[in-house]
From Swiss-Prot:
Residues 1-110 form the Thioredoxin domain. SUPFAM superfamilies: Thioredoxin-like. Gene clusters encoding host-selective toxins (HSTs) are localized on conditionally dispensable chromosomes (CDCs), also called supernumerary chromosomes, where they are present in multiple copies. The CDCs are not essential for saprophytic growth but controls host-selective pathogenicity. The gene is AMT13. Pathway: Mycotoxin biosynthesis. Thioredoxin; part of the gene clusters that mediate the biosynthesis of AM-toxins, host-selective toxins (HSTs) causing Alternaria blotch on apple, a worldwide distributed disease. AM-toxins are cyclic depsipeptides containing the 3 residues 2-hydroxy-isovaleric acid (2-HIV), dehydroalanine, L-alanine which are common for all 3 AM-toxins I to III. The fourth precursor is L-alpha-amino-methoxyphenyl-valeric acid (L-Amv) for AM-toxin I, L-alpha-amino-phenyl-valeric acid (L-Apv) for AM-toxin II, and L-alpha-amino-hydroxyphenyl-valeric acid (L-Ahv) for AM-toxin III. It comes from Alternaria alternata. Keywords: Disulfide bond, Redox-active center, Virulence. It comes from the Eukaryota. Disulfide bonds join 36-39. The lineage of its organism: Eukaryota, Fungi, Dikarya, Ascomycota, Pezizomycotina. CDD domains: TRX_family. Pfam families: Thioredoxin. Belongs to the thioredoxin family. Induction: Expression is up-regulated more than 10 fold in toxin producing cultures. This is Thioredoxin AMT13.
């Protein structure tokens, strides 16, 4: 996993499988589609969350471009946010709900979480 804190878009199953194996970090998958209005609306808030919670890693997953991963994750609605830690899903937020996503992030971060209030 790179140290670049930009939100990266996963291009294929191999990339997903590599990211999911990372231990010790909270990983958030933003499962979206380009035709999804709520996905576009929440994007700026997701960027803010990725910057506010510096010890998390955010990845975008276009369900139309990587359908096998979307099916494996049982994505039925976009946007869906999946939170993984040590290879296990620890939370799921369905819909464009930034407050619920932030609550899930906070609940799953250990001590030493870095957060800057807005």
């Amino acid at each position: 996993m790179s140290d670049n804190k930009a939100i990266q878009t996963l291009q294929n199953t191999k990339e997903f499988n590599e990211v999911i194996k990372v231990k010790g970090s909270l990983i958030i998958f933003d499962c979206f589609s380009t035709w999804c209005g709520p996905c576009k609306v929440i994007d700026p808030q997701i960027l803010k969350l990725s910057q506010a919670y510096s010890d998390t890693y955010f990845y975008k997953l276009n369900v139309d471009e990587v359908p096998d991963v979307a099916q494996k994750l049982d994505i039925r609605f976009v946007p869906t946010f999946l939170l993984f830690k040590d290879g296990e899903k620890v939370a799921e937020v369905v819909g464009a709900k930034p407050k619920a996503l932030e609550d899930a992030i906070r609940a799953n971060l250990g001590c030493g979480a870095t957060h800057s209030s807005n």
